[in-house]
């Protein structure tokens, strides 16, 4: 019997401009690639192309990935959506999987209505907690709510995200499916200097790296031989560098900029503790990656992380609380030996390719039956 065909409409997806953009969506698709025939279509706006619309095809482990690059402008957006519609019709899917609500869920809903094809939605967007949802226009909100009600299932990465969506009036059949953590490990030694690490977007309103620098400043008064590695880029990078300079931390703090997944894993493996000081996270894959590298985590109670972090994996603190963060960092230095690397690694088996793939496959079977 031939395999069922699943079409993935991805609002975020790795591309030539941003190779790590929505990589967690790509990993979700990879986790189920053996069960069905898959095709991915995503759209990316950029002015780096010569023509108004450019179609680029890539094959990853027998999955066809199509990225439509288009220049800014309403007419170009309409044209590219029309091409996505035609490509969808040619593929003749048995099921559509929309990743991150927006044009993806709207097109999935319309195709479902006209071609009697079921669809499900996976949501990762943190905008339901922030101002993002409130700033959507009336039509966008209505389309999201209709698509959500008509979808066979909405898969969210945490109960925290589900609760935020319900508060915004997005009613649906919900299920919780976390992100994939590959379980990569590197057999390399730790830094000789006790090392804290942060990896993520350098945006103050979400990640609060300012609080990390201020807490680190307090800790270094008591422990001189420590360091802090900051991986990532964003609009507040200069502000953070200026603050590091102002606090005279430059001999202890290193800014690494945007780096590859491999670089992040290597740095995590060499470090002692990951710090997540976010105001909100729908899941926080970096926490799971740290555990897979055998290092404990200091994290704020910011939504997603506390669904799988506990006293055995590190220390949970209140949001926007520098005193608690300072104390947690001091405790990690003094009590570090209590965290067993192999036990930390075992905590992320629930997010393995096989485990997440099985959960997604169950949703496919329900939708198709």
Label each PLM-derived region with a short phrase.
Residues 20, 118-120, 127-147, 183:
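Nucleotide-sugar donor phosphate/pyrophosphate-binding loop at the beta->alpha transition
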Residues 27-30, 114, 137-154:
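Membrane-proximal helix-turn-helix segments that form the acceptor-binding/catalytic region
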Residues 296-299:
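Short hydrophobic beta-strand element within catalytic cores of glycosyltransferases
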């Amino acid at each position: 019997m031939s395999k069922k065909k699943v079409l993935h409409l991805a609002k975020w997806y790795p591309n030539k401009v941003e190779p790590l953009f929505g990589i967690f969506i790509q990993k979700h698709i990879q986790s189920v690639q053996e069960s069905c025939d898959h095709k991915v279509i995503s759209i990316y706006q950029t002015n780096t192309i010569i023509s108004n619309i450019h179609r680029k095809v890539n094959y990853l482990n027998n999955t066809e990935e199509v990225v439509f690059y288009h220049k800014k402008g309403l007419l170009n957006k309409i044209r590219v959506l029309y091409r996505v519609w035609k490509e969808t019709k040619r593929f003749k899917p048995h099921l559509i999987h929309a990743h991150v609500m927006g044009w993806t869920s709207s097109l999935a809903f319309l195709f479902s209505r006209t071609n009697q094809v079921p669809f499900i939605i996976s949501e990762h967007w943190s905008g339901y907690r922030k101002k993002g949802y409130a700033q959507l226009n009336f039509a966008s909100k209505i389309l999201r709510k209709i698509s959500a009600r008509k979808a066979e299932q909405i898969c969210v990465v945490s109960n925290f995200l589900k609760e935020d969506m319900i508060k915004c009036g997005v009613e649906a059949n919900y299920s919780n499916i976390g992100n994939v953590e590959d379980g990569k490990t590197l057999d390399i030694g730790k830094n000789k200097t006790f090392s804290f690490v942060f990896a993520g977007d350098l945006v103050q309103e979400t990640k609060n790296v300012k609080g990390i620098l201020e807490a680190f400043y307090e800790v270094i008064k008591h422990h001189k031989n420590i360091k802090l590695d900051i991986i990532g880029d964003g609009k507040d990078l200069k502000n953070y560098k200026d603050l590091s300079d102002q606090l005279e931390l430059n001999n202890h703090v290193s800014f690494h900029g945007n780096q590859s997944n491999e670089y992040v894993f290597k740095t995590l493996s060499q470090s002692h503790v990951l710090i997540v000081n976010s105001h909100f996270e729908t899941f926080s894959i970096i926490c799971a990656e740290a555990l897979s590298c055998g290092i404990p985590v200091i994290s704020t109670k910011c939504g997603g992380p506390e669904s799988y972090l506990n006293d055995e994996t590190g220390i949970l603190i209140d949001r926007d609380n520098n005193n608690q963060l300072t104390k947690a960092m001091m405790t990690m230095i003094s009590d570090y030996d209590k965290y067993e690397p192999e036990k930390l690694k075992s905590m992320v088996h629930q997010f393995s390719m096989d485990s997440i793939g099985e959960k997604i496959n169950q949703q496919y079977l329900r939708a198709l039956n």
